[in-house]
Regions:
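Leucine-rich repeat
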Residues: 1-478
Length: 478
């Protein structure tokens, strides 16, 4: 039978699943009331369990033309609706609805306008709104006109919708808006604001922006003010120039408060083996000078930067960041693209960084494994590692002969409880020697954590070592 809904039902005592099957005829009023005795308890609909994506005509008639006018889900609070051409909106869009997530597939968008009209008239209390719609489409104006009637939003997220200047201005004037995500900023945005009407998001604490080009995001930031934003996340596809990256960070300094910003994430999202040669030819290198504008934000706790650039940061560079942000919780640099360097941070530099930032819970850097062979002067007894840490070593090169020294060092420093990873980035598999590096690191992490036993390096002949070797081989494959 064709399933219509798979919904999570929650009341004071239990959570369970309701499945509503196809109708072969219109239900009468008694049958409808029996059905509503169950559906009135539904607070949340998380989607549609319809493998064929389409509903038969009898079911549509039954749902959209019931014998009574009362809504089918009178107490519905949250709705995530995905991939249907026809939505029985009149019985889903109710005044109790406060959270709405519409996820349309290609070809589904003709149903959008009718649904938005019903939502606009029957759902005055929506506070959390998300719309994902595939491009190309012609519904930008329709959606903008609809959102302008929403004045109580606390969170708004969109993907695939291009907003005009009037829409940006409207969002900035919603007094309750705390979270905003605009993940489809055009390459050449046509926005113009007068000095008297420039958008100021005075209540916004979380802002996410995405575009093909970093310059487009910079353009929007330059036209707005985010005086209390705490979390700023920027995603883009194309590899930015050095000038574009510098301009972006400079714009952030002028747009955001130096005191309120806690998290900054600047991440390229497009990774391809076929782009590697083109991107490497750019020769861009991330240095301390590129990151220095971020140091104006004195309360930063989370810094995530991922670019299709080489990384050229030294021990002293990271310690300079640590001195500025001693309470830093996460520092993630090129966790997907890699550092693309034969060097990296030395063991001494890593330990000094961990000592300076005892609150670190996430760290992604590249290290020089040859430095682990030398004695760790000054840290044998006095080193206090952060209590828990997810340590990613990015694309750090490793020699098989250094595996034993690395295991001994990590164990001596009390890092056995750490979560380790290396060579897991999407774009690292095309680097020469990636498979062997990942293999060797998995041996290191396995022995440090106590997962593997037997001779270090997997050279033993006992049965447990053979099983460990097979396990490492499986984990080393992409």
């Amino acid at each position: 039978m064709l399933s219509l809904l798979r919904s999570n039902l929650t009341d004071a005592y239990c959570s369970y699943t309701l499945q509503l099957y196809s109708f072969k005829r219109r239900p009468n009023e008694t049958e409808w009331n029996i059905l509503r005795s169950y559906t009135r308890r539904i607070w949340h609909i998380s989607g549609c369990a319809n493998p064929d994506r389409w509903l038969d005509s009898d079911t549509l008639i039954a749902i959209c033309s019931p014998p009574v006018t009362d809504p089918l889900f009178p107490n519905l609070r949250s709705l995530h609706w995905k991939g249907l051409k026809i939505i029985p909106a009149v019985h889903i869009a109710v005044s109790s609805l406060t959270r709405l997530y519409l996820e349309f597939l290609q070809g589904d968008v003709p149903a959008l306008k009718d649904f938005l009209d019903v939502v606009q008239s029957q759902c005055p209390n929506i506070k959390h709104y998300q719309i994902d719609i595939p491009r190309p489409h012609t519904f930008d104006k329709t959606i903008c006109d609809h959102i302008r009637h929403q004045t109580h939003l606390q969170e708004f997220r969109s993907h695939g919708v291009i907003f005009d200047a009037a829409m940006i201005l409207h969002l900035s004037r919603i007094p309750t808006l705390a979270r905003l995500s605009l993940v489809w900023i055009p390459d050449e945005p046509d926005w113009t604001f007068s000095s008297e009407s420039a958008p100021v998001f005075s209540t916004l604490t979380h802002m996410e922006m995405g575009s093909q080009l970093l310059e487009s995001v910079t353009r929007l930031l330059s036209l707005t003010q985010l005086p209390v934003v705490e979390d700023l996340s920027v995603t883009f596809h194309a590899c930015p120039s050095e000038e574009a990256f510098k301009s972006h960070l400079t714009t952030i300094r002028h747009t955001c408060s130096s005191v309120s910003l806690v998290t900054i994430k600047i991440r390229a999202t497009l990774f391809s083996r076929f782009l590697s040669d083109v991107l490497i030819e750019s020769g861009h290198r991330l240095t301390l000078g590129d990151v220095r504008p971020c140091m104006a934000f004195v309360n930063l706790r989370h810094v995530h930067i991922n670019l299709q650039w080489y990384v050229d940061l030294t021990d002293s560079d990271l310690l300079a960041l640590a001195s500025k942000w001693p309470r830093m919780h996460s520092l993630v640099i090129n966790d997907q693209w890699g550092w693309r360097t034969t060097g990296g941070i030395t063991l001494q530099g890593l330990l000094q960084l961990l000592q300076a930032c005892r609150s670190l819970s996430e760290l992604c850097i590249a290290i020089r494994t040859d430095s682990f062979v030398n004695p760790v002067h000054g840290f044998e007894t006095g080193f206090l590692a952060p209590p828990s840490l997810a340590l990613s070593l990015a694309d750090s090169p490793i020699r098989s002969v250094d595996v034993s020294a690395l295991v001994d060092t990590f164990k001596t420093l009390g890092m056995s409880a750490y979560s380790f990873s290396a060579w897991d980035g999407i774009s690292m598999a095309n680097i020469e020697g990636a498979g062997q590096h990942k293999w060797d690191w998995n041996w290191v992490f396995g022995w440090v954590s106590g997962k593997y036993s037997g001779p270090i390096g997997g050279c033993g002949s006992d049965e447990s070592s053979e099983e460990d070797a097979r396990s490492v081989k499986e984990e080393s494959s992409w």
